[in-house]
Structure formats: structure tokens, C-alpha cells
Amino acid sequence: MEQFHDGHHVWLRSRANGLYLCADDDRSGVSLQQDRASAHAAWAVHILHFNGGDVLMLHSAANGRYLAAYRAEGSWNVERRDLNRLPSLTFSWYALGSRYGDDVLLRHFKSMFFLRALFRRDRISNSGGVGLCAMDRGTTTMQWVVEAIPPRESVPTLPDPLSPSSLSGVYRVWYVRANPDGIICPNNWRLFLFYGRSVRNLSALLAIELGIRRPSDAILCVRAGFFGRLTPLVTNLPHNNMLLNLDIVVITAGTSAADRLRYPNVDAA
């Protein structure tokens, strides 16, 4: 567990095929991809102290949702979910040392299975899948290289507004503005419907709603579940074909709360 530091970001690279564990461009998918220079490949470390020990949880730097494993129709699936309960073994992992250098094995607390890269690699898309394995077979498919991601020195620029043809889906956005110390009042949550996926458009609308003169002063943070940690929203919203809920906490630039936010420098060498 010494390679995982609370609040920091990491890449997880499969020893078997060299691909990185990534959050897909949808709401819940997880896969292996070659490109690590993306928020989708960065994972924030959330250490939970539980029963006298430490539990590892990982949430995506893209949309804040947590790496989870759950049982469905007799098999275990890996995906991202909102953290609405603590403690929850669905989201809990333990990093074990492997037989090879500093590589780690990630063992899921609830199933006691290991996170593994599915051995096949799609040569066309240069991607792969992930799943769980019941036992340590000593193969590289279960070994993960933990690469620390340094923080950025400045807030990343939001993507350009999407074209009208890219505006799909609708979100039920619950939003609240935090005070300068990052504290939010539970009674101040408000709701509006947002059409599309553009984070820049969403930022501009929330700045207007909250009376913030410059949209760049409104730092949008997504909260994936009641117990989810705040994740700065720097990518466009996931594709969706249904009405989805989205919790947004707005942090004001220049405040102590803004200074505590950490952005992974995914372009670092």
C-alpha cells in the first residue's frame, strides 16, 4: 500500500500488455488503453481507515466515480459507481506486493478476487478489457505497475464548447456553491436541467446562476455519491441516452478551498 498516497493521483499500467487502466467515455465502463495523457487514465487515491487497517479506493479523475466490482448473474464485473455508502466492500481494494519488483496485485475485498487484465489485446483499437481472477496464478495479467502522477501547477483549460451535433443527453444537475473554506450548506442545493455534454457550457451557465462574474472563477467539482470526494470536472460529460443525476459543488477560484484542489499532470513524462 506504500505506493498509494491519499489524495494523490496514479496511473495503473498492466504488466501483461503495457496498457493503462482507464475510465471509458461513458458513465461506468472501465478498460485498458494505450494513451495515458488523459484524465480518463488518472486515478485519485482515497485511503479509508477501517477496522484498524487501511482500505484502498480509487476514483476517476475524469468524472469522480469509484472503481468497483459487483456480482451479477453469477459472475463478477468491474465498473465505476457512485460512492453512496461507507464503509463499502464493493469499492474496497488491497494492494499486495507481487513477486516481481514493485508491481502490485489489487485484491478486491468483497470477492477476494484479483483485478486482472484480460489477456487479449485488440490490435485495431489498441485496447483491452479488465476483470477479476479467483486466485494469484503468478501471471503478469494480475500485475500492475503503479506510476505516480505529479500535480499540475495551474488549473487546466476546459475543452472548447462542443458543436450542436455533439449535444446529446440531458442531466438533472444538483449544484451548490461552497464557502471559501470548502464547506457546503446542505440546504443550499439547487436543481436545473442541462442539455448536452459540454463542461464549458455547463460552467458558464452555473456562473450565471450563482452570480459569478467570470466563468473561469467557477471551478466545477463533481461529487460521485454522498461519500464521494470532490473531483475537479475538466472533461466533457459522459455520453448518455437517458436522464442522469449529476452533483456539482462549485468552488470559487482564489479561495483556500480552490488552493487545496489537486489536478493530475497527465502530460508529464
In which residue ranges do the predicted regions lie?
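Surface-exposed, Lys/Arg-rich phosphate-binding patches that contact polyanionic backbones
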Residues: L205
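Glycine-centered loop/turn motifs
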Residues: H5-G7, L243-L246
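Extended, charge-biased low-complexity segments
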Residues: I212, N241-L244
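Chromatin/DNA-recognition segments of nuclear transcriptional regulators
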Residues: R223-N241
